[in-house]
UniProtKB/Swiss-Prot annotation:
Signal sequence annotation: none
GO cellular component, as recorded: extracellular region
Family annotation (Pfam families): Urotensin_II
Protein name as it appears in the record: Urotensin-2
Entry's localization field: Secreted
GO biological process, one term: regulation of blood pressure
């Protein structure tokens, strides 16, 4: 959803 929603290889 934004740049702060990046987890491992998944940026949503």
């Amino acid at each position: 959803a934004g740049t702060a929603d990046c987890f491992w290889k998944y940026c949503v």
